[in-house]
UniProtKB/Swiss-Prot annotation:
GO terms for cellular component: cytosol. The keyword Cell inner membrane does not apply. The lineage of its organism: Bacteria, Pseudomonadati, Pseudomonadota, Gammaproteobacteria, Vibrionales. Forms oxaloacetate, a four-carbon dicarboxylic acid source for the tricarboxylic acid cycle. Coiled coil: none annotated. NCBIfam families: PRK00009.1. The active site is at H138, K544. Its EC number is 4.1.1.31. Its cofactor is Mg(2+). This is Phosphoenolpyruvate carboxylase. GO terms for biological process: carbon fixation; oxaloacetate metabolic process; tricarboxylic acid cycle. Gene3D superfamilies: Phosphoenolpyruvate/pyruvate domain. It comes from Vibrio vulnificus (strain YJ016). Signal peptide: none annotated.
Length: 877
C-alpha cells in the first residue's frame, strides 16, 4: 500500500494479526493456514498471476462444507475491521491532506472572501441553514447492532493506541482489550437469525442517536460557533437549529405489512421515552456541575426564595419531570391503559428553565460555566426536541385511493377508482371545504382500509412536533395529494401536516411540475399548505426504470421545474431527496452531489434520507458525524451563496440526447433482452437474498412479479454481489460514446470542466467502474448460469470495458479515480479480501442449487459471504 497511508496500513495489519490469533485459538492451525493461503493467492491473482488465480479457484472448490463458514467469516470479519480502521483513519491525527479534506467550513469562508460575498449575506445564510437528515432502516445495513457496538469500541481502542505518551501498562491494557473485542466479534453471530421487526429497526435508529448524534450535534455547533466568531465576529445564535433528524423506522409502511398503526404508536412512545432518558442523563450531570449560589431575579423566582443552590433546585424539578415522563411512557409501552398524559409535552418545558439558568450565569459573571455542558444541553433540546427524531409516515398512493373507493361505493355515489382525475379533484376539494363529516358512523371498512384510517387517527392524536412529513409513494396526480389531506382532516388532525408527493418513475418525474402547478391553482389547497410545499424526488426507482443517466437528468429537470413553479407561485419549497448508498440509488459524495443540483434548489434547506449502511459510515461515530455535518453545511451554504452556473442551452440539448440514448440502451437489455431475467436470476444471488434476514420489508412489492416488481434495493444489491453492478452504469457510457461518434467530444469535455452536474455524474461512474470486476462476474456466469446465457454476460462485460474507455476519454484521464487517490486506495485495499468472498459465494450458490435441499451449514456460510461482500463494497444498496 502507498506509504502515504502507513498509519492506516499499520492498523489494518495489527487488526488482521489479532483476528488471525482469534481464528487460530478457535479453529486451530488448519483453518488459519487455509485463510492465509487463500489471501495470498487472491493478492497474487489481483496482481495478474493467472496460475495463482486458477489455484485460488481450485483451493475454494476443494473446501469441505464444514470449512466454508469459518473461512467466509474470516474474510467477512477482516472487511469489517478494515472498514473501522479506514473510518478511524479519516478522523485520526495521522490523517493527512491526501485523505482528509481541509476543514470544509473554513475552506468555504476563504472562497466566499475571494468571491467578495458580503459577510451580512453569509450571516443570514447561516441563520437560515436547515439540514434535516432522515434515518431509514433500509435492509442494506447488514451489520447487526451487537457487532456495530463492538466496532465502536474497537475504534476507541485505536484512538487510545495513537497516543504516543501511553505508559507500557496502559498500552498493554488497550491492546488486550482490542484482542478481547475481536474475539467477542468472532464468537458472535455475524448476521441476524431472524428478520428484524420494525420495532427493532427503530431501536437501531435510537442507538445511532445515543451512541453518536447526541454527542456530535453539540460538538458540531460548538465548532461552527467558533469558526463564525473568527470569520464574522458573531457566533451562532443560541437557539439555532441547523441540523435535526427524522426517521422512517416504524413509519414507512409502503409495501411493508409489518408496519401497522400499533407499531407506529409504539415507536412514537419509545422515541419520547428515549429522549426523556437521554435528557435525564444530561440533567443529572448538570446537577453535579451547577452548584453556584449567585443568580439573577428570574432564576431566584423559579427556584424559590429559600433555595441556597438555585440552579440545582431548578434542575431537580426537571429531573422529576423527566423521571415521571419515563415512568408513564414505560407503562404505556407495556400495554397499561393510562388516562394520564406524560408530563413532558413540549420543548418549552425544557428550554425555558435551562435558558433562564444560562442567562443568569452569564449575567452573574459566570459565562465560562454557562458555555459548558449547559449550552450543549440547550443545543440538544433544539435539535432533538421531546421526540428525539420526528417520524415520517410513508404510504403508497393506491392505498389512499382504495379507502375512498370503498367509501364512495358504500355511500352509493360510484367507485372513486373509476372516476376521471377531474371528478376526483372536484369531489376532494368539495369534501375538504365541507363542514360535515364524510365518514358514516355505521360504516364497517375492510381491514386494509381500516389500517389506513387508524394510522391517520394516530397522527391526529399526537402533536405536530412528533412528525416530519406524510410521504405518498408512487404519487402521480394532484388527487393523490388531496386524498391524504382529506383523510387526515376526517381523522380530526388539528394541524398542518407536510403532505409530500414522492415522484419515482421517469414519467412521474417528468410530470411533477404539472402536478404541483395544478395543486397551486386550487385556492383551498393553498390555504391548507400555508405557503409551504414539500416534494420528494425518488432516485432508486427512477434509475431502476430508466438507468442512471436518464434518471439523473430527469431528477435535475424535475427539481429545476419545481423551483421555478415555487418562485412563480410565491411558495416555499423543500425538496426531499430519497438517495441510497449506491449510484443506482442516487448515492454520491455529499458535497459533490449537492453542488451538482440546479441553482436555488437548496434555498428551502436540505432534507435527505440517510439509508441503511450509510448511516453507520457517515454518522456512526461522533467525529465522523461532525465531519458529515460540516460537509453538508458547507455545500448548502456554497450552493446558496455561490450558486452553480445555469447550464447552457447546448449542454441541455446534449443532455437530452444522452438521456434518451442511455434510456433506450438500458431498457433494450433489461426489458428487451429475452434472456435477461433468467440470466439475472442465475448469475446473481437474487433468489437467495430473499431469505436473508435483513430489513423488515419483503424484497418484492408483488411476490409474483418479475424484475419490475423487485424493490430497487434487492435489484441493486444482487448486482453488487456478483461485481457487475449493472444498474449503476448500464446505458450511460454507451450514450457518451454515441455523442462522441456524432462529433460532440469537445462539448462533452466542456460540460465535464464547467458543469458540476455532469462532472459529478462521471465521477460517480468512475467509482462504480473501479468496483466492478469482470473476471469475478464471468466466474459467477461460468459456475452458475446455463451455457446458453454466457454470451449475454460476455456482451455486458464488453460493453462495460467500452464504457470505461468512453468516460476516461471525455475526462482526459488515463486511470479511474486518478483525481481521488484516497478513494482509489480504499477500494483497492478491500478488493483483496472481497474477491475470496466472491469466489466462496459462487461456490456456495453452486452447491446449494445443486443440492436442492439446503443444509443449515451451507446457508449460514452463504449469508456470511453476502454480508461480507456488502461490507467490502461499502455502498451496497
Amino acid at each position: 500500500m502507498n506509504e502515504k497511508y502507513a498509519a492506516l496500513k499499520s492498523n489494518v495489519s495489527m487488526l488482521g494479526h489479532l483476528l488471525g490469533n482469534t481464528i487460530q485459538e478457535a479453529h486451530g492451525d488448519e483453518i488459519l493456514e487455509k485463510v492465509e493461503t487463500i489471501r495470498k493467492l487472491s493478492k497474487s491473482a489481483r496482481a495478474g498471476n493467472q496460475a495463482d488465480r486458477n489455484n485460488l479457484i481450485e483451493e475454494i472448490k476443494s473446501l469441505p462444507d464444514e470449512q466454508l463458514t469459518p473461512v467466509a467469516r474470516a474474510f467477512n470479519q477482516f472487511l469489517n475491521l478494515t472498514n473501522i480502521a479506514e473510518q478511524y483513519h479519516t478522523i485520526s491525527r495521522h490523517c493527512d491532506a491526501h485523505v482528509c479534506e481541509p476543514d470544509a467550513i473554513n475552506t468555504l469562508f476563504a472562497k466566499l472572501g475571494q468571491n467578495g460575498i458580503n459577510k451580512l449575506d453569509t450571516a443570514q445564510a447561516i441563520r437560515e441553514l436547515n439540514i434535516e437528515l432522515v434515518l431509514t432502516a433500509h435492509p442494506t445495513e447488514i451489520t447487526r447492532r451487537t457487532m456495530i457496538n463492538k466496532l465502536v469500541k474497537i475504534n476507541e481502542c485505536l484512538s487510545k493506541l495513537e497516543l504516543s505518551d501511553l505508559s507500557y501498562k496502559e498500552r498493554h491494557k488497550t491492546e488486550k482489550r482490542l484482542e478481547q473485542l475481536i474475539a467477542q466479534s468472532w464468537h458472535s453471530d455475524v448476521i441476524r437469525k431472524q428478520r428484524p421487526t420494525p420495532l427493532d429497526e427503530a431501536k437501531w435508529g435510537f442507538a445511532v442517536v445515543e451512541n453518536s448524534l447526541w454527542e456530535a450535534v453539540p460538538d458540531f455547533l460548538r465548532e461552527l460557533d467558533e469558526k463564525l466568531k473568527d470569520y464574522l465576529d458573531q457566533g451562532l445564535p443560541i437557539d439555532a437549529r441547523p441540523v435535526h433528524f427524522s426517521s422512517w423506522m416504524g413509519g414507512d409502511r409502503d409495501g411493508n405489512p409489518f408496519v401497522t398503526h400499533t407499531v407506529t404508536r409504539e415507536v412514537l412512545l419509545l422515541s419520547r421515552w428515549k429522549a426523556a432518558d437521554l435528557y435525564l442523563k444530561d440533567i443529572n450531570e448538570l446537577i453535579s456541575e451547577l452548584s453556584m449560589t449567585k443568580c439573577n431575579d428570574t432564576v431566584r423566582q423559579l427556584a424559590g426564595e429559600d433555595e441556597h443552590e438555585p440552579y440545582r433546585a431548578i434542575l431537580k424539578q426537571l429531573r422529576t419531570l423527566l423521571s415521571d415522563t419515563k415512568e408513564i411512557l414505560d407503562a404505556k409501552i407495556n400495554g397499561q391503559k393510562l388516562a394520564v398524559k406524560a408530563p413532558l409535552q413540549s420543548v418549552e418545558q425544557l428550554w425555558d428553565p435551562l435558558f433562564a439558568c444560562y442567562q443568569s450565569l452569564r449575567e452573574c459573571g459566570m459565562s465560562m460555566i454557562a458555555e459548558g455542558s449547559l449550552l450543549d444541553t440547550l443545543r440538544r433540546v433544539k435539535a432533538f426536541g421531546v421526540h428525539l427524531v420526528r417520524l415520517d409516515i410513508r404510504q403508497e398512493s393506491t392505498r389512499h385511493a382504495d379507502v375512498l373507493s370503498e367509501l364512495t361505493r358504500y355511500l352509493g355515489i360510484g367507485d372513486y377508482n373509476h372516476w376521471s382525475e377531474q371528478d376526483k379533484i372536484a369531489f376532494l376539494t368539495n369534501e375538504l371545504a365541507s363542514k360535515r363529516p364524510l365518514l358514516p358512523r355505521d360504516w364497517q371498512p375492510s381491514e386494509p382500509v381500516k389500517e389506513v384510517l387508524d394510522t391517520c387517527k394516530i397522527i391526529a392524536a399526537q402533536s405536530r412536533e412528533a412528525f416530519g412529513a406524510y410521504v405518498i409513494s408512487m404519487a402521480k396526480t394532484a388527487s393523490d395529494v388531496l386524498a391524504v389531506h382529506l383523510l387526515l382532516q376526517e381523522s380530526g388532525c388539528p394541524y398542518r401536516m407536510d403532505v409530500c408527493p414522492l415522484f419515482e418513475t421517469l414519467d412521474d418525474l417528468n410530470n411533477a411540475e404539472a402536478v404541483i402547478k395544478q395543486l397551486m391553482s386550487i385556492d383551498l389547497y393553498r390555504g391548507f399548505i400555508q405557503n409551504h410545499q414539500m416534494v420528494m424526488i425518488g432516485y432508486s426507482d427512477s434509475a431502476k426504470d430508466a438507468g442512471v443517466m436518464a434518471a439523473g437528468w430527469a431528477q435535475y429537470h424535475a427539481m429545476e421545474a419545481l423551483v421555478n413553479v415555487a418562485e412563480q407561485e410565491g411558495i416555499e419549497l423543500t425538496l426531499f431527496h430519497g438517495r441510497g448508498g449506491t449510484i443506482g440509488r442516487g448515492g454520491a459524495p455529499a458535497h459533490a452531489a449537492l453542488l451538482s443540483q440546479p441553482p436555488k434548489s437548496l434555498k428551502g434547506g436540505l432534507r435527505v434520507t440517510e439509508q441503511g449502511e450509510m448511516i453507520r459510515f457517515k454518522l456512526g461515530l461522533p467525529d465522523v458525524a461532525v465531519n458529515s455535518f460540516n460537509m453538508y453545511a458547507s455545500a448548502i451554504l456554497e450552493a446558496n451563496l455561490l450558486p452553480p452556473p445555469e447550464p447552457k442551452q447546448e449542454w441541455r440539448d446534449l443532455m437530452e440526447v444522452l438521456s434518451q440514448v442511455s434510456c433506450e440502451a438500458y431498457r433494450s437489455v433489461v426489458r428487451g433482452e429475452p434472456d435477461f431475467v433468467p440470466y439475472f436470476r442465475q448469475a446473481t444471488p437474487e433468489l437467495e437474498l430473499g431469505k436473508l434476514p435483513l430489513g423488515s420489508r419483503p424484497a418484492k412489492r408483488n411476490p409474483n412479479g418479475g424484475v419490475e416488481s423487485l424493490r430497487a434495493i434487492p435489484w441493486i444489491f444482487s448486482w453488487s454481489q456478483n461485481r457487475l453492478l449493472l444498474p449503476a452504469w448500464l446505458g450511460a457510457g454507451e450514450a457518451i460514446q454515441y455523442s462522441i461518434d456524432k462529433g460532440h467530444q469537445a462539448l462533452l469535455e466542456e460540460m465535464c470542466r464547467e458543469w458540476p452536474f455532469f462532472s459529478t455524474r462521471l465521477g460517480m461512474l468512475e467509482m462504480v467502474y473501479l468496483k466492478c470486476n469482470s473476471e469475478i462476474s464471468r466466474y459467477y456466469d461460468e459456475r452458475l448460469a446455463d451455457k446458453s446465457l454466457l454470451p449475454l454476460g460476455d456482451r455486458l462485460r464488453d460493453q462495460l470495458q467500452s464504457d470505461i474507455k468512453a468516460v476516461l476519454n471525455v475526462e482526459n484521464n488515463e486511470n479511474l479515480m486518478q483525481s481521488d487517490p484516497w478513494g482509489q486506495e480504499s477500494i483497492r485495499l478491500r478488493n483483496i479480501y472481497i474477491e475470496p468472498l466472491n469466489m466462496l459465494q459462487a461456490e456456495l450458490l453452486y452447491r446449494t442449487r445443486q443440492a436442492g435441499v439446503v443444509s443449515e451449514e451451507l446457508e449460514e456460510a452463504l449469508m456470511v459471504t453476502i454480508a461480507g461482500i456488502a461490507a467490502g463494497m461499502r455502498n451496497t444498496g
